[in-house]
Design a protein with these regions (language model features):
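Short alpha-helical transmembrane segments in multi-pass integral membrane proteins
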Residues: 1-22, 75-138, 178-186
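Interfacial/gating helices of multi-pass transporter permease domains
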Residues: 11-18, 37-61, 123-127, 186
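Residue-level signature of transmembrane alpha-helical cores of multipass secondary-active transporters
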Residues: 18-26, 60-61, 135, 161
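Alpha-helical transmembrane segments of multipass membrane proteins
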Residues: 21, 25, 29-33, 64, ...
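Helix-terminus/linker motif at the lipid-water interface of multi-pass membrane proteins
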Residues: 23, 27-51, 115-120, 180-183
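Membrane-interface helix-loop junctions in multi-pass transport and translocation proteins
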Residues: 48, 159, 169-186
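Small-residue-rich hydrophobic transmembrane alpha-helices
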Residues: 52-101, 145-156, 160
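Short runs within selected transmembrane alpha-helices of multi-pass transporters and secretion channels
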Residues: 68-71, 134-153, 161-171, 186
Length: 186
């Protein structure tokens, strides 16, 4: 095969059309974190705001840990197995993580997590608990997001990845803005 024929192959266009949005999606967090930090630094107690955000997100990401492998699982099995079985399995996994999230956040288990594991107290503990209560659904959404991104990759529908990445970015900024302007920390 000649060098010129190598790049006329449609594979390279499809690969780039998937690689670019997925790469941006993976690195959007590095871009979004300083923006969110800039909101938190403007609060009346920046150290508290950043600490509350960090602890809350750590707990939520721990609960949603399966989301890190859902994308791979979907990519590997989506074309060779029943799509309904895969959708059901992922939905079941998302529901299980949601139930765990509800149990940890809305039961006395939150006392063990916040007091014993993270050692929070006073105003920080109250704010972390409030942050967890308004974001308890994040593990559910993360699992579904990774599943749908994987379907987009397998079906070569990069426009869905762009839509998901851009809308996630916009909603994150919008949500942070609303919380900031409503003075949520009080």
């Amino acid at each position: 095969m000649k060098f010129s024929e190598l790049f006329s192959d449609r594979f390279y266009l499809v690969a780039l059309s998937i690689l670019i949005p997925t790469s941006i999606n993976l690195s959007i967090t590095q871009f979004l974190t300083p923006i969110l930090n800039s909101f938190m630094v403007r609060s009346t107690n920046p150290e508290l705001s950043i600490s509350v955000f960090s602890i809350s997100m750590s707990i939520l990401f721990l609960i949603s840990l399966p989301h890190l492998r859902v994308q791979h699982l979907t990519i590997v099995y989506y074309k060779n197995y029943s799509k309904m079985k895969i959708h059901f399995f992922i939905f079941l996994l998302a529901i299980i993580c949601l139930i765990i999230s509800i149990f940890v956040i809305f039961s006395p288990a939150v006392n063990f997590v916040l007091d014993t594991i993270f050692g929070t107290s006073g105003e920080m503990r109250i704010n972390v608990e409030n942050a967890l209560r308004i974001s308890f659904f994040i593990p559910f959404l993360l699992i579904l997001k990774m599943h749908f991104y994987a379907i987009s990759i397998v079906s070569s529908k990069s426009n869905y990845i762009w839509i998901g990445t851009i809308s996630g970015f916009i909603f994150s900024i919008l949500f942070a803005s609303i919380l900031y302007f409503l003075n949520f920390e009080k």
